[in-house]
Amino acid sequence: SDEETALLTPFEDPKEAAEYLLGTGVRLVAVTLGSEGVLICSRDGSRKVSGFVSHVVDTTGAGDSFWGAFVSQLIRADKSLEEFSIDELEEFARYGNAVASLCVEKRGGLRSIPEESETFERLAVK
């Protein structure tokens, strides 16, 4: 997350931190930015992927739900990290953002994780 970039790198700015990490050999960097979305960086480029508008009830599980959704898309694509274009990574990040935006609209952790059909509905809004 943007709060942790200073712990992992000499930089507080998410973009600078991501570029630093790529320079160390990391192949994919995703810095979550709370309600603002996520910054995705790879050797193919970088993108800030906006979050979705949601009625926030409880932020419990938002980060975990983003990461679960994002990583699930990487796994489903069945490619190595180097093969993903920045456009593909942006779509995976949008999916993760959609899941997280739905998660914060309900109370609790596990019960707030949306069904995939709800996620597709949210993706269609934007």
Enumerate the predicted regions with their spans.
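Active-site rim beta-loop-alpha module in soluble metabolic enzymes
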Residues: E4
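Conserved phosphate-binding/catalytic region of the ribokinase-like
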Residues: P10-K126
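Residue-level signal for inorganic ion chemistry
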Residues: S1
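Small/polar glycine-rich anion-binding or flexible loop at a beta-alpha turn
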Residues: L7
